[in-house]
């Protein structure tokens, strides 16, 4: 990583970048065969938004234009990433951002009920995704963006496996792409 030179990866490559890509492919046990590197998390989110759009258009589903993210999230400083970040962060920029539906964040310190187990609370939060998908119309939802560990806005709150499993099920059921924003958590 100390020797990677930032180049526009659509047209150029370099040996350290290729070695890193090969290493990541090996770690994935054959699940991944391509990579695309970005200079920042914001650019990665922008790329994921574009990729989600192209994916659905190529599949003959151009009506999938809605994206969902979580309240209290931070996905970056570009306009697309700001669109996905908590809505309270950008009223100044609201004329420029893409509207995104927000569902409650997983934040047990503030939102878990006293009589609720951690798993029950996590599933309640995850089920808000299904409600949002159905409210928007499942055939119009492109992607759900989620931070697995919310860093800057909640103070390093990890998401439990039961939540992640449930959102995976929901996304698979309705044809929604699941995008993990893991830039800050490593």
Say what each PLM segment does.
Residues 1-62, 76:
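Glycine-rich loop-to-alpha-helix module at the N-terminal edge of alpha/beta enzyme cores
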